[in-house]
Amino acid sequence: MSGEDNLLKLVEVEGPDDQDYLLQEQVGFILRKAHQRHVSIFAAHIGDLTPPQFAALAKLRDVGETSQNQLGTLIAMDAATVKGVIDRLKARGLVELSKHEVDKRRLLVNLTAEGREAIERLIPLAREITAETLTPLSAKEAATFMRLLAKLA
């Protein structure tokens, strides 16, 4: 029986043993390993953007111009992180910033034409990345996994 099979048995049947603490059986460790695998697959397909940069472009594609803070909320990033992401995308000419017409303190972010072209080109690759990440799972397992992850998020 493989280590993965043992873990599944532990999770599905027995529950954790209070006497032992094995890192490889902890949810955070397993999530981190799965995340590392996904990021590696992402980098192999889209090497010139980070997943947070891609997320920002994809969300801007969906919602259009929005405030920097709202974009951060929409893509689950704190203000400092989203600012860094936007700064790097702006330096590459993929997004542009403007001041809000009424509240000049608010910065609005939007895709440039180059940013729109980039995200439209990358969306099919993102679908491939998701499919490759979920390859070890059957279609039913993948659907269950996504539903359970969404519940945890």
Model-inferred region functions:
Residues I46-T50, T81-G84, R88, S138:
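Short glycine/proline-centered loop/turn elements that form peptide/ligand docking sites
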Residues M1-D48, L111:
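N-terminal leader segment of winged-helix/HTH proteins
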Residues E25-F29, Q36, L49-A58, N69, ...:
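Short alpha-helical elements of helix-turn-helix
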Residues G72:
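The alpha-helix within a helix-turn-helix
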